[in-house]
Swiss-Prot record:
Top-level taxonomic group: Bacteria
Protein name (database record): Elongation factor G
PANTHER family (UniProt xref): RIBOSOME-RELEASING FACTOR 2, MITOCHONDRIAL (PTHR43261:SF1), TRANSLATION ELONGATION FACTOR G-RELATED (PTHR43261)
GO (cellular component) term, any one: cytoplasm
Keyword match Cytoplasm: yes
Annotated compartments: Cytoplasm
InterPro entries per record: EFG_II (IPR041095), EFG_III (IPR009022), EFG_III/V (IPR035647), EFG_IV (IPR047872), EFG_V (IPR035649), EFG_V-like (IPR000640), EFTu-like_2 (IPR004161), G_TR_CS (IPR031157)
GO BP terms, alphabetized: ribosome disassembly
Protein's job: Catalyzes the GTP-dependent ribosomal translocation step during translation elongation. During this step, the ribosome changes from the pre-translocational (PRE) to the post-translocational (POST) state as the newly formed A-site-bound peptidyl-tRNA and P-site-bound deacylated tRNA move to the P and E sites, respectively. Catalyzes the coordinated movement of the two tRNA molecules, the mRNA and conformational changes in the ribosome.
Organism of derivation: Listeria monocytogenes serovar 1/2a (strain ATCC BAA-679 / EGD-e)
Length: 695
């Protein structure tokens, strides 16, 4: 089967924005105008095509990026809808990784918002060219030029309008095209047939001014155009479009368009801008990878090259089971064929290949370079894995995901839920690399960890809906540790005599602090067999077992040394068990002599805020027992780096949001352990009922 759309006529784009800027509605309208939907679904009525998880429809937010394919003016446009909430940055990161270009949607009233800044930075990291769509021009307070100004101030972006709105709020009726220098009026409700007219007289001067600014900005990026511009020659329409395309592809220029997706105005010209200015797979640099012999190699967007692709999302579908979304970088793949998962070193069979249209799917027999599709039948492939030709193997650059930062205990409500919960957690962890589930060795509780409170809420909710598992969720917890600050020699003696054979184990151990991060080190310094050699492993095992349940508040002991140097034994009564118990008693006794302390996880926190909030934010970090480690200006924002105890970071997202009118963002990850101040340590010990008791 021949290719339906050439590579040059393929666009892989993401729609990215702050939560509530109208991203999903914009995608809906694209699907409507490109003929994939016959009835428009509204997000605020909970009937949107892209938001197909029940929860997304209820909350009106997009959680998973659904990939959809559409056609416009002889081009194929593959669209990935990305979430706008900070807890789902992993979804945004992984979509950006496989896209060639993006449409950044802004709310015309707010302009650039905090999450826009986060997503914009991620897109810049991946070198993704962007077109900006200023949406909601019909909203009260909509201000197009203010929104464009925020692109300059908050993102230091070289963004310029290629359109101007005609009217705003209730009177928004069309747009001025600054390249064609004409006006488009929307007169029917569905916006199917805009009328082309002359630019209204009262806006002619403004249009001329912004056309002049556009020409100047484009000329600055191109020497030939600059020469023409300086010599006063006319720059043609074609030259202007070519200049905008070149600047956009080089991520040096961002064309800005406007409209209102909800009222069906301005969506088709935005689609035209996607075709005109965003890259085809052939316009972006070839993807790099590593061959089995360690050599670096590139794969170009070309059907004749060996097949290579990247799995960027795994989902469980109620009808077809496990779906693996993948982006083809080179070559072709037929359904039913075998591929190599070079990341895991496993052979996989691609059962069927589906092209996704929001929630409806169509089966296809072959995919080509530049395509985005979903495979059914892959068993071992997870997010970030490379799938490639078995004979021409390569591992493509993968994605890096942050470590989870928040942990809660979860327990099934009934015995029936118990087994199902394990399976559900395993499935969710497979789909989401920033989610972990593990069993706490000390309490036997199941702990789940993720990127934030909303992230975990949604996952627990999905467990209930998709896997029918009811669970109780505890409060967020901190994983404390314990260690020793001093060295001391301690005795442990276990003697039981109760008729017949007794128990006898006796050791002298020197305990002391170890270097940070070195863990537990055991040294056998017994001379002359005072403790027989066969009991030494039992002493070590007894200590290791006792470490998990510390001496102050029951938290694991880390970074300590133990040197076994003396002891005694009994010919008949000594056995492994007795020496195990003696060793653990020695560790308990060390609590009195070795100055044990509690350690807490310290997070490396980075807060990005507008300058005017700097004083308040610094004060708040100090009040949370944080230490500011450094500051720098980024664009017109301030970046504050600090170390803050995890225990004091709960609820910080809410505080930051309200304290900066939603303009501050922060990231945090675990950095190191540090001693807890005495007063707080006492509270922790009290809360845990104290562990320093005689055995």
């Amino acid at each position: 089967m021949a290719r339906e759309f050439s590579l040059e006529k393929t666009r892989n784009i993401g729609i990215m924005a702050h939560i509530d800027a109208g991203k999903t509605t914009t995608t809906e309208r694209i699907l409507f105008y490109t003929g994939r939907i016959h009835k428009i679904g509204e997000t605020h009525e909970g009937a949107s095509q892209m938001d197909w998880m029940e929860q997304e429809q209820e909350r009106g937010i997009t959680i998973t990026s659904a990939a959809t394919t559409a056609q416009w003016k002889g081009y194929r446009v593959n669209i990935i809808d990305t979430p706008g909430h900070v807890d789902f940055t992993v979804e945004v990161e992984r979509s950006l990784r496989v896209l060639d270009g993006a449409v950044a949607v802004l709310d015309a009233q707010s302009g650039v918002e905090p999450q826009t800044e986060t997503v914009w930075r991620q897109a810049t990291t991946y070198g993704v060219p962007r077109v900006v769509f200023v949406n909601k021009m019909d909203k009260i307070g909509a201000d197009f030029l203010y929104s464009v100004g925020t692109l300059h101030e908050r993102l230091a972006a070289n963004a310029h309008p290629i359109q101007l709105p005609i009217g705003a709020e209730d009177t928004f009726e069309g747009i001025i095209d600054l390249i064609e220098m004409n006006a488009l009026y929307y007169e029917d409700d569905l916006g199917n047939d805009p009328h082309i007219k002359e630019i209204p007289a009262d806006l002619k001067d403004l249009a001329d001014e912004y056309r002049g600014k556009l020409v100047e900005a484009v000329a600055e990026l191109d020497e030939e155009l600059m020469m023409k511009y300086l010599e006063g020659e006319e720059i043609t329409k074609e030259e202007l479009k070519a200049g905008i395309r070149k600047g956009t592809l080089n991520v040096e220029f961002y064309p800005v368009v406007c409209g209102t997706a909800f009222k069906n105005k301005g969506v088709q010209p935005m689609l035209d801008a996607v075709l005109d200015y965003l890259p085809a797979p052939t316009d972006v640099p070839a993807i790099n990878g590593v061959l089995p012999d360690g050599e670096e190699a590139a794969r170009h967007a070309d059907d004749s090259e060996p097949f290579s692709s990247l799995a960027f999302k795994v989902m469980t579908d109620p009808y077809v089971g496990r779906l693996t979304f993948f982006r083809v970088y080179s070559g072709t793949l037929n359904s039913g064929s075998y591929v190599q998962n070079s990341t895991k070193g496993k052979r996989e069979r691609v059962g069927r290949i589906l092209q996704m249209h929001a929630n409806h799917r169509e089966e296809i027999s072959i995919v080509y370079a530049g395509d985005i599709a979903a495979a059914v039948g892959l068993k071992d492939t997870t997010t970030g894995d490379t799938l490639c030709d078995e004979k021409e193997q390569i591992i493509l650059e993968s994605m890096e995901f942050p470590e989870p930062v928040i942990q809660v205990a979860i327990e099934p409500k009934s015995k029936a839920d118990q087994d199902k919960m394990g399976q559900a957690l395993a499935k969710l962890a497979e789909e989401d690399p920033t989610f972990r589930a593990e069993t706490d060795q000390e309490t036997g509780q199941t702990l789940i960890s993720g990127m934030g409170e909303l992230h975990l809420d949604i996952l627990v909710d999905r467990m209930r809906r998709e896997f029918r598992v009811e669970a109780n969720v505890g409060d967020p917890q901190v994983s404390y540790r314990e260690t020793f600050r001093k060295s001391a020699q301690v005795e442990g003696k276990f003697v039981r005599q109760s008729g017949g054979r007794g128990q006898y184990g006796h050791v002298w151990i020197e305990f002391g602090p170890n270097e940070e991060g070195k863990g537990f080190e055991f040294e056998n310094a017994i001379v002359g067999g005072v403790v027989p050699r066969e009991y030494i492993p039992a002493v070590q095992a007894g200590l290791e077992g006792a470490l998990d349940n510390g001496v102050l508040a029951g938290y694991p002991l880390i970074d300590i040394k133990a040197k076994l140097y003396d002891g005694s034994y009994h010919d008949v009564d000594s056995n492994e068990m007795a020496f195990k118990v003696a060793a653990s008693m020695a560790l308990r006794n060390a609590a009195k002599k070795c100055d044990p302390v509690i350690l807490e996880p310290m997070m490396a926190v980075e807060v990005v805020i507008p300058e005017e909030y700097l004083g308040d934010i610094m004060g708040n970090i100090t009040s949370r027992r944080g230490r500011v480690d450094g500051m720098e200006a980024r664009g017109n924002a301030q970046v504050v780096r600090a170390f803050v105890p995890l225990a004091n970071m709960f609820g910080y997202a809410t505080h930051l949001r309200s304290g900066t009118q939603g303009r501050g963002v922060y990231t945090m990850q675990f950095d190191h352990y540090e001693e807890v101040p005495k007063s707080i340590a006492e509270e922790i010990i009290k809360a845990n009922g104290g562990n320093n008791k005689e055995d």
